């Protein structure tokens, strides 16, 4: 198992928040944890070429740009097989039950989730999305320990 943390050293603007990107290579599959900028994404593709990976899985911890902004490049390059992330739209009925103040509806909850989680929502027609709550085994020996659904 090899874990590589990408840094902004040598990037066009290393002072900018280039975000996170961690590569987890178990020897037969590559898992990318977040991809905060396009320069990270370019390095991911280089790594994949050097290690003969045509596809990788990606775990997106959350919606923020510094974790997301390199993902469109990876999709454009066709290198992602699946993205594991929070699929809150799937749980809109449960969320409504928890926050039901008689002012919200299922539709308003769905619209609000789509607004707040716009980056994740934008992926829904471009790549296979997996639920981080239920699909926790990403690859051999690579598991998502949390968050759990109660979080």
Region spans (language model):
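Conserved beta-strand hairpin/beta-sheet module of binuclear metal-dependent hydrolase folds
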Residues: 1-51
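Flexible, acidic/histidine-containing loops and adjacent segments that form or flank the divalent-metal
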Residues: 1-6, 68, 73-151
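Generic serine detector
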Residues: 7-9, 15, 28, 54, ...
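Detector for Asparagine
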Residues: 17-18, 26, 63, 100, ...
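Active-site metal-binding motif and surrounding structural segment of the metallo-beta-lactamase
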Residues: 29, 38-90
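Conserved residues at beta->alpha junctions
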Residues: 35, 62, 146
């Amino acid at each position: 198992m090899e874990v590589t943390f990408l840094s902004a050293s040598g990037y066009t603007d290393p002072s900018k928040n280039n975000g996170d990107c961690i590569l987890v290579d178990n020897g037969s599959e590559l898992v990318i944890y977040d991809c905060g900028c396009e320069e990270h994404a370019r390095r991911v593709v280089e790594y994949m070429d050097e290690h003969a990976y045509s596809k990788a899985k990606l775990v997106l911890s959350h919606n923020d740009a510094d974790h997301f902004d390199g993902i469109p490049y990876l999709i454009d390059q066709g290198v992602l097989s699946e993205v594991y992330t929070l699929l809150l739209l799937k749980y809109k009925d449960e969320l409504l039950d928890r926050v039901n103040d008689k002012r919200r509806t299922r539709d308003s909850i769905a619209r609000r989730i789509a607004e707040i989680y716009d980056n994740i929502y934008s992926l829904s027609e471009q790549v296979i999305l997996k639920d981080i709550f239920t699909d926790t085994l990403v690859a051999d020996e690579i598991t998502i320990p949390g968050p759990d659904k109660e979080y």
